[in-house]
Amino acid sequence: MSYVPIVIEPTSRGERAYDIYSRLLKERIIFVCSTVEDHMANLIVAQLLFLEAENPKKDIYMYINSPGGVVTAGLAIYDTMQYIKPKVATLCIGQACSMGSLLLCGGEKGMRYSLPHSRIMIHQPSGGYKGQATDIEIHAQETLKIKRLLNELYSKHTEQELQHIEKSMERDNFMSPEEAKKFGLVDNIISSRDVMALLAK
């Protein structure tokens, strides 16, 4: 069982306890800090919708430290980021791999950041299926459709030619923050909050 720190704050009615993630949510900070799967994706989507309802004009900050995961779960988060009214700034801490890298580059243009020693990785989707030959063929065709979709999304957000994206994603493609910036996955590399505040002006 993982331990989640509790923050205790004084209020006019006594003390109030929050888990650390709920407290950060009050500051409009969302953490994507594990494998992307359906349950966590639903929680992230709910947080995005809640923050939009609370203030549709105020920016949201998404911190990403994820090895990636299920494509459909990641696309649920991605689509919600594009759907809501607030701008979503993204920041890679540690790693943003596979679907994590799509969420990173899917942030608001000019507000996609990486810390200096993060790693970013893109690649084509993978899948495995057992069953009848016809069913295997159906799933293979679906995987190819998803591959084309992801290539188009990366092309859109990096502003690179689709052919270059396809070639770059054929195998696991690890990048430093500098390489990710050159590729178009992030806009800036930041080493301190002061730098981020300066860039936001």
Swiss-Prot record:
GO biological process: protein quality control for misfolded or incompletely synthesized proteins
InterPro entries attached to this UniProt entry: ClpP, ClpP/crotonase-like_dom_sf, ClpP/TepA, ClpP_His_AS, ClpP_Ser_AS
Record field: transmembrane: none
This protein's GO CC annotations: cytoplasm; endopeptidase Clp complex
Name this protein carries in UniProt: ATP-dependent Clp protease proteolytic subunit
UniProt enzyme class: hydrolase
Record key words, sorted: Cytoplasm, Hydrolase, Protease, Serine protease
Entry EC no(s): 3.4.21.92
Job of this protein: Cleaves peptides in various proteins in a process that requires ATP hydrolysis. Has a chymotrypsin-like activity. Plays a major role in the degradation of misfolded proteins.
GO molecular function: ATP-dependent peptidase activity; ATPase binding; serine-type endopeptidase activity
Gene name of the record: clpP
Alphabetical list of PROSITE patterns matching this protein: CLP_PROTEASE_HIS, CLP_PROTEASE_SER
Disulfide bonds: none
Subunit-level organization: Fourteen ClpP subunits assemble into 2 heptameric rings which stack back to back to give a disk-like structure with a central cavity, resembling the structure of eukaryotic proteasomes.
Major site of localization recorded for this protein: cytoplasm
Active site: S98, H123
Protein family: Belongs to the peptidase S14 family.
Locations listed in the record: Cytoplasm
Reactions catalysed according to its record: Hydrolysis of proteins to small peptides in the presence of ATP and magnesium. alpha-casein is the usual test substrate. In the absence of ATP, only oligopeptides shorter than five residues are hydrolyzed (such as succinyl-Leu-Tyr-|-NHMec, and Leu-Tyr-Leu-|-Tyr-Trp, in which cleavage of the -Tyr-|-Leu- and -Tyr-|-Trp bonds also occurs)
